[in-house]
Swiss-Prot record:
The organism's taxonomic lineage, starting at the top: Eukaryota, Viridiplantae, Streptophyta, Embryophyta, Tracheophyta
Reactions catalysed: L-methionine + ATP + H2O = S-adenosyl-L-methionine + phosphate + diphosphate
Function of the molecule: Catalyzes the formation of S-adenosylmethionine from methionine and ATP. The reaction comprises two steps that are both catalyzed by the same enzyme: formation of S-adenosylmethionine (AdoMet) and triphosphate, and subsequent hydrolysis of the triphosphate.
Compartments, record wording: Cytoplasm
Keyword Cytoplasm attached: yes
Keyword entries, A-Z: ATP-binding, Cobalt, Cytoplasm, Magnesium, Manganese, Metal-binding, Nucleotide-binding, One-carbon metabolism, Potassium, Transferase
Descriptive protein name: S-adenosylmethionine synthase 2
């Protein structure tokens, strides 16, 4: 049996880039909670002792940007300079302007257009992917890397591993078998965890705790064997982290946010963007399409692409590839996708309820992945029953 190795990585919520994603989405939540028609394009950057939010926001909402920044940093665990940032004493810079009137008239006619007439907020192409290798219909390498990162945060916050600090990265290599286009995981080849820690702990303690409290509860035993390689804090020291260790920027972790290197990516980031931005809404609807195709049994693995022009509601193109795993030809599946999914941005926002913010709805997406999550707020993860005429075999 011929196998191959494939690797996916993740970072947890204390990574500086992910901190920025979460602040941008916390701002989006705050705007949408008060004004569902808010137009938000919010970027965040951070470095030692400083966070800046900037971008274009048009909203009726009254938003205290500085409070959102400090609250988000504090919730993640950035409460002192020692851990990489002090939420209550860092500098917060805000430079936010209104959306360009040129963009506004072209996209939503200064809020006069009906939902089905709303144009895409920009050009671009987005991909959705699904695979039957996990219950989430997501790639195993990505699922494990993501869950290890989430588990690191859990054991830090609940006191199981008090030596942990907020910043950390994970990476998982899985050995796969290609079953006529479908991906079948055989075993976990390598697990890599690099996590920020305090001065009190030894490398041996770090390795023992990570194996016992992080890896064991997350990686199913059937995938581990005596040959599995573990790299646990291989650099030997990771005390300085968060924005003190590296600068952070919104939209720098787009592969972690999606499919861990599987499928494809059009390059657009998600966080800090309202649903007229097709980078986000387009990627969400094609995930629902790909997932629904696989869940319905039409294919074991599927990718869907959609593309847009600024100001134009209808997509320019829709593409489907099932990697040879389709029960019917791809062109038939493409027809089913087009008949069952409305790719116009205004209709995506309605069908996936994307104008509803608040309650950390989008903040939750900004760490540990936008896809494969069981949470009613992740409306794009709901499998849509597909209507089509059954072709008799």
């Amino acid at each position: 049996m011929e196998t191959f190795l494939f690797t996916s990585e993740s970072v947890n919520e204390g990574h500086p880039d992910k901190l920025c994603d979460q602040i941008s989405d916390a701002v989006l939540d705050a705007c949408l909670a008060q004004d569902p028609e808010s137009k938000v394009a919010c970027e965040t950057c951070t470095k030692t002792n400083m966070v800046m939010v900037f971008g274009e926001i048009t909203t009726k909402a009254q938003v205290d940007y500085e409070k959102i920044v400090r609250d988000t940093c504090r919730a993640i665990g950035f409460v002192s300079d020692d851990v990489g940032l002090d939420a209550d004493n860092c500098k917060v810079l805000v430079n936010i302007e209104q959306q360009s009137p040129d963009i506004a008239q072209g996209v939503h006619g200064h809020l006069t257009k009906r939902p089905e007439e709303i144009g895409a907020g920009d050009q671009g192409h987005m991909f959705g992917y699904a695979t039957d290798e996990t219950p989430e219909l997501m790639p195993l390498s990505h699922v494990l890397a993501t869950k290890l990162g989430a588990r690191l945060t859990e054991v830090r916050k609940n006191g199981t591993c008090p030596w942990l600090r907020p910043d950390g990265k994970t990476q998982v290599t899985v050995e796969y078998y290609n079953d006529n286009g479908a991906m079948v995981p055989i075993r976990v080849h390598t697990v890599l965890i690099s996590t920020q820690h305090d001065e009190t702990v030894t490398n041996d303690e770090i390795a023992a705790d990570l194996k016992e409290h992080v890896i064991k509860p997350v990686v199913p035993e059937k995938y581990l064997d005596e040959k599995t390689i573990f790299h646990l804090n291989p650099s030997g020291r990771f005390v300085i982290g968060g924005p003190h260790g590296d600068a952070g920027l919104t939209g720098r972790k787009i592969i972690i946010d999606t499919y861990g290197g599987w499928g494809a990516h059009g390059g657009g980031a998600f966080s800090g963007k309202d649903p007229t931005k097709v980078d986000r809404s387009g990627a969400y609807i094609v995930r629902q399409a790909a997932k629904s195709i696989v869940a319905s049994g039409l294919a074991r693995r599927c990718i869907v692409q959609v593309s847009y022009a600024i100001g134009v509601p209808e997509p320019l193109s829709v593409f489907v590839d099932t990697y040879g795993t389709g029960k019917i030809p791809d062109k038939e599946i493409l027809k089913i996708v087009k008949e069952n999914f409305d790719f116009r941005p205004g209709m995506i926002a309605i069908n996936l309820d994307l104008k509803r913010g608040g309650n950390s709805r989008f903040l939750k997406t900004a760490a540990y992945g936008h896809f494969g999550r069981e949470d009613p707020d992740f409306t794009w993860e709901v499998v849509k029953p597909l209507k089509f005429e059954k072709v008799e075999a």
